[in-house]
Amino acid sequence: MDNVSIVDFLKRRGRDKSKINIFPSASLTKNLEGKNMTEFGLLQNKGIIGFTDGIKTIQNPRLMSRIMKSAYDLDSLIMQHAEDSELAENGTVNDGIIATKLGLQGISELAEKIIIERDLSLLEDFNCRYHISQISSARSIDVIDKRKNEINFTTGVSINNLSLNENDVGDFKTFLKLSPPLRTEDDRIELVKAINKNLIDVIVS
């Protein structure tokens, strides 16, 4: 959602037709293109509780710095899917043994780590409400562990990455080609440990 009329419609529809409360998020950029910011102030005044481009990452650091500044000024929550598009290269599984075995393009854990490091560095200057939507690797946890007491941010993890690993992809199980991808068993174990260490704040499905 990137305009006020859609937010109005959704909230009216929820109020009139649903028995549950709807707390919508809007997109960070118009049409999820990662180029131009949406109208944070107008959307937030209509009841938006946060901003995210879903599984699309804000790749441009200049744009992310502008987003963080606006989020700080308006006390908005921004949620980032951490994946460098150049390193991910349209991969579908973890860059490892399974990718090689199946002849698939892999996604390096560096694609996640680099975006997290960049955003947390920007966060030092802007100090807005920032959430890393889903982490998947031990290397990302190392970064988070080092920065958690220095700056204010939250992190999430998918139940898939907590309960499955890259071996579960098996022989081309397309429904397990996820974003972020399932990583190694060592990564999965470190994610579970990170929950016990309070390094992860949210579990999503």
Task: Give the role of each language-model region.
Residues 1-17, 26:
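Metal-associated gating/positioning segment near the N- to mid-region
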Residues 26-27, 53:
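Short glycine-centered, acidic/aromatic-flanked micro-motifs in structured strand/loop junctions
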Residues 27-33:
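Active-site beta->alpha loop and helix N-cap motifs at the rims of alpha/beta catalytic domains
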Residues 35-203:
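Histidine/acidic residue-rich metal-binding segments in metalloenzymes
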